[in-house]
Regions:
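Local beta-strand/beta-hairpin segments that build beta-sheet-rich folds
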Residues: 13-20, 53, 57-59
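A short beta-strand micro-motif
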Residues: 2-11
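A short, charged, amphipathic alpha-helix used as a generic interaction element across diverse proteins
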Residues: 11-15, 22-45
């Protein structure tokens, strides 16, 4: 199981978590990540996570 954490890009809550999207396959998550990624957003881009033994671990390179 994989997830993307999507962050607010504007307003008073800028940078706070907006929502999470869940995926059963890494490839699905990567496709969605690439749709959302904007270089100029730097730290506001989504973060990618994998569920390993019941714990969410952040994936490097995303």
């Amino acid at each position: 199981m994989f997830k993307l954490r999507i962050y607010k890009l504007s307003g008073a809550d800028k940078g706070n978590l907006d929502h999470e999207e869940f995926f059963s396959e890494r490839e699905e998550m990567e496709t969605r990540y690439n749709e959302l990624f904007v270089y100029e957003n730097y730290s506001l881009n989504p973060t990618a996570w994998e569920n390993v033994d019941g714990e969410w671990k952040r994936l490097e390179g995303f």
